[in-house]
A protein has these predicted regions:
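FabD-like malonyl-/acyl-CoA
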Residues: 2-13, 17, 23-217, 345-389
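A generic local structural motif
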Residues: 57-60, 143, 187-188, 230-232, ...
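Alpha/beta catalytic cores of group-transfer enzymes, especially the acyltransferase/condensing modules
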Residues: 77-78, 169-324
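Conserved strand-to-helix beginnings and helix N-cap segments that scaffold or border functional pockets
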Residues: 82-85, 125, 249, 278-282, ...
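Charged catalytic carboxylate motif
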Residues: 134, 284, 329
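N-terminal cationic-hydrophobic initiation segments that often serve targeting/anchoring roles
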Residues: 143, 257, 293, 338-341
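A short, acidic, amphipathic alpha-helical segment used as a generic capping/interface helix at domain edges
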Residues: 325-344
């Protein structure tokens, strides 16, 4: 595939650094040969390494129009639905992933995704691995339908657990190892959620809304009820005037108007994710990540913790753990991904996986970037463009 040699896949100082191994680790299994409609990602990366020297690749990148690059966004928990990945088993890579997932997880993830029941799929311990695998299955679909999109990818970001999928796609983590880490993370977060009754409240506020003050008053109210060390804090920054507040939330629900909240809706999750109530999940995840081989990503991957690019393997290990108890800075991440000089064209953006929430958020963060947005569903549906909020 001649076009692949010019792809800016190895940005970020990754040129010539074991690219084939990174791509092979990405999927964690042997892959079909050249008889398929599109080459596998391992094949593509091997072609890239063999066909082009680093200096030539750099020169080509300098001449490349910014819009020719692509950005992939990976969704998080809450995007799952019964029936996702239906029909994707036609792709050998997807079949490989689900076969391996069953061995890693100890249960039939594909059947759970296709048939439910919904209550079981929505449990944190199940939906995080489900979204992780479904997102990478959507990448496999994209690679068969539009391989040039994958070839030209220059950056990736994932929302919460979606960050693991982004790092697998970028060659920093192996598929099986990352899935096991997601399993441990999900089970630990489920257990932490059950230990302390709590929740998450999605809020769209007016300009005068003061989220910190609202959270402070909510904590004081909890203390007056005898709750020790109550938690109520912003856990997700979605887009301007939209936040997710997590912790002990009844007071905020009952007093939404007082704090200039236009809309306040409880999310169907089991606990206060990305707050200190998730501290019991930190050590189990940290121990797993210590045992996993992590490499520098083959393209730019942005962290939820600070909205900046991952720099090296230790950086990834540290921030993936910190992310569990830190707010998701998604709005800030979108600004980092799409920051560019005035007049520079925006890249094509593909949300890969179930749901289109990240596209809706992107529209609110950066309308110009959203105009180049497409959604790659985790079913056999066609690729959809510009999903409206």
């Amino acid at each position: 595939m001649g076009g692949w040699a010019a792809a800016p896949w190895r940005l970020g100082g990754c040129s010539g650094r074991g690219g084939l191994r990174g791509a092979a680790r990405r999927w964690g299994s042997s892959r079909p040969g050249a008889g398929d409609r599109a080459a596998t990602l391992s094949d593509l990366l091997q072609t890239s390494v063999e066909a082009e020297e680093p200096d030539a690749a750099a020169a080509r990148r300098e001449r490349r129009c910014p819009r020719e690059g692509t950005v992939l966004l990976f969704p998080g928990q809450g995007s799952q639905f019964v029936g996702m990945c239906r029909g994707l088993q036609r792709y050998p890579g997807v079949r490989d992933m689900y076969r391996l997932a069953e061995k890693v997880l100890g249960y039939d993830l594909l059947s759970l995704c296709l048939e439910g029941p919904r209550d079981a799929l929505d449990r944190t311990q199940h939906c995080q691995p489900a979204v992780f695998v479904a997102s990478l299955a959507a990448v496999e679909k994209l690679n068969h339908l539009q391989p040039e999109v994958v070839e030209r990818c220059v950056a990736a970001a994932g929302y919460s657990v979606g960050e693991f999928a982004a790092l697998v796609f970028a060659g920093a983590l192996g598929f099986a190892e990352a899935l096991y880490a997601v399993k441990v993370r999900a089970e630990a977060m489920q257990k932490a959620s059950e230990a302390v009754p709590s929740g998450m409240l999605s809020v769209v506020g007016r300009r005068e809304a003061n989220y910190k003050f609202a959270c402070l008053e909510a904590r004081k109210h909890c203390e007056s009820l005898g709750i020790e060390n109550p938690v109520c804090t912003v856990s997700n920054y979605l887009f301007p005037d939209s936040r997710v507040i997590a912790g002990h939330l009844q007071f905020l629900q009952e007093n939404a108007r007082k704090y200039y909240f236009k809309r306040a809706k409880m999310l169907p999750v089991s606990g206060a994710f990305h707050t200190r109530l998730m501290e019991p999940a930190v050590e189990p995840l940290a121990e797993v990540l210590k045992s996993i081989e992590i490499q520098k990503p083959l393209l730019c991957v942005y962290s939820n913790v600070d909205g900046k690019k991952y720099m090296h393997s230790k950086h990834i290990q540290k921030l993936l753990v910190k992310q569990v108890v830190s707010p998701v800075l998604w709005e800030q991440t979108m600004h980092s991904v799409y920051e560019r000089k005035q007049g520079t064209e925006f890249p094509y953006t593909y949300e890969v996986g179930p749901g289109n929430q990240l596209g809706a958020i992107l529209k609110q963060c950066n309308l110009k970037a959203w105009k180049q947005y497409k959604h790659v569903d985790s079913t056999m549906c066609i690729i959809a463009m510009n999903i409206f909020f």
